Amino acid sequence: MHAQDKDFHIYLAFGQSNMEGNARVEPQDSIGISERFLMMSAVDCPERGRVKGEWYKALPPLSRCHTGLTPCDYFGRTMVDNLPSNVKVGVINVAIGGCRIELFDKESCAEHIATQPDWLKNIVKSYDNNPYAWLVDLAKKAQKDGVIKGILVHQGESNTGDKEWPEKLKGVYENLLSDLNLKAEEVPLLVGEVVHADQKGICASMNDIIDTLPQVISTAHVISSAGCPAAGDNLHFTARGYRMLGARYAETMLQLLGYKAMINKQEATRMKLWYSAPARRWVEALPVGNSRLGAMVYGGTD
């Protein structure tokens, strides 16, 4: 498969509700989106004028018609802000709230779905009862347009305590690489932590398992959720939490692509690159792209 445009970087995303997008989209999330940040609609969405398998400007929601803000939103925004102006970024998001990693097992997903509650079965129907195959089909279509550069995952809450989870995710990753004729060293796996213990995350113990992934998958990179604000259920992130987490996915990916993705706080202060309304705490600051410097600058207050 030969890509039509090597400067169109495509990222596959899958997982459960935090990748699907649980927070309400706020006004700021639908403005200032670059024409270089695109999403491939994973399903038909007539009310938004979207057709499955077609590219659109990445206005949220990026999963299905009525989902919310996702890490993909600010992953893509941050990427295009920091990549050369000739590079476009596209995301394909197939995520199902409440699912276990077993739902993406290409060999046994049918048996797994049979054991699940009706509400999950109804969501899975949107993906023809096989989200893995659905994602692969979309990815193959996308490969006619650009180059798959990475795979983003946020899943684990429904597998909390499952010590075999890293191996199960490894199987999904390796299947994707094989089915799409990709090389692991060219397509890293970026996996976000669930809501952190510092936010009283009810599944925070799963992060101990997630953090072992690089020992199982040499091309896996764990994205910290520390400090990312949680919603009242302590299971999902707030909109601000998704913005922060998405930017962290991008920071890691930019580094892997060879870009200096962050400069230190003192230099950021000296350069006076700030938002008009500074973050209340440094950890809340979001990246300000500077493609010419090849850097991602954070502005905020202590």
Where on the chain are the PLM-derived regions?
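Cell-envelope and extracellular/periplasmic
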Residues: 4-261
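Aromatic-residue-lined binding/catalytic grooves and analogous aromatic/hydrophobic interfacial grooves
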Residues: 263-302
